[in-house]
Amino acid sequence: MKKFLVGICALFVLLVSCGKNDDTPQPKPVPSSEITILAYLVANNNLDDDLLTNIGAMYDGLAEMDQQATLLVYWDGKTKIGSNKAQHLILKYVTDGKGNINGLPALDMNATLNDVLDEAEIVKEYETQYSVDKDIMNKVLKDMVTLAPSSKLGLIFGSHASSWLNSIYTSRAFGQDGAGDDTMLIQDMAEAISSTNKKYEFILFDACYMGTVEVAYTFRNICDYQISSVMEVPAYGFPYEDFMKYLYKGNVENYKLVCKSFVDFYQSLYSNGNTAWATVSLIDSKEVGNLVNEIKKEIVEHKDALANYDVNVLQEYGRTAGPYIAYDLEQLISDLNGGNVPATFGSQMLKTVLYKNSLEKARPASYAVDAANYSGMGIYIPVEKRPKWNEYFKTLDWYTASGWSEVTFNWKF
């Protein structure tokens, strides 16, 4: 009898429960982002404060997410973080897409940067190391991939940079870890990334002068898309608080919104009387090889004109630290063809540069960009005034692939 009554009660509870479930809407599960983002910040230089601020901006961006998402940040800077006061470590932030980060309600606008750093989960610490060493970068990236396994990965690199060059003032191409000579070439950087044996959805270069065809060529087989600036990037860098949700959602249209957010941010600063300038591009890596074929065709066809070419007729992107570092690619091709862009070249540029934007008015005014002659991609044109650059230029794979090796200059090259 007791068993029977228990059975009746259990059936009653089950029926009541079923009826309740039918009437009460259940909360929808929060979707998970398919992309995990890895940020590699080399800040043992005068960008320490700015790159720390970027971590805070990334946190703010995560707080606005409506997806579950993971962010890992490798930090190498002057500022020491955590209870062990580490200078080389990996921070982890995970949002549930419902306003919580690392299991706690996201910090509000009154929180300090130290509060944000305290909220991080420190998942790895390192002894003192040079983060711009190829093997060190590869090891750290492999650690990050292991710590946050994902089928899709995105990369952010933040530091100083100088496009393909091995020298502007120092040996910098990317990064500056302490002394000026503690830097790395982009070929080594590309190899360090490639050796993780992962294909990345995107690389966002929060660093100067990385929006050149030489850089795009170097990273073409490593990631699907490249987001970069052909000019210097202001010290604040990219406004991560405005676009993390787009980076995590992926696809071309969202990456375009990332680029637009960058220019909108600096346009707002300019409109309010602040120092501001910006160039940004979205590059389709799989189309870079086809673009290089078109470039080579044009360089070889016009090699006599290029033998003693006057670069002063072109829009230059090295406004202060890097005179001669990059000129507008499409404007060069147009000038070589009497002011007309060949149809095949123009068509390929549209396939390769999926988005471009800039500030036509800037502060200082010398950083303003002529939109009519801005194609979203720069190119180095050998000039007599840069003999050391030229010597190094001839060692690059790009030198042959682009057709520059077939130009006989009217000066010692």
Question: What are the residue ranges of the model-derived segments?
Answer:
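Surface-exposed flexible segments
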Residues: D49-Y59, N84-D96, I168-T183, E391-Y399
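Active-site groove signature of glycoside hydrolases
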Residues: A148-W164
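Structural recognition of the beta-strand scaffold that forms the well-ordered cores
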Residues: T36-L41, T70-W75, G154-F157, E201-F205, ...
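Terminal, contiguous helix-loop blocks that mediate binding/assembly
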Residues: K142, T146, A161-S163, Y169-F413
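Bacterial Sec-dependent N-terminal signal peptides
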Residues: M1, G7-E34, V383
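Short acidic, gly/pro-rich beta-turn/loop elements at beta-sheet edges
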Residues: L47-D49, I81-S83, L165, V215, ...
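N-terminal extension/subdomain marker
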Residues: G19-P149
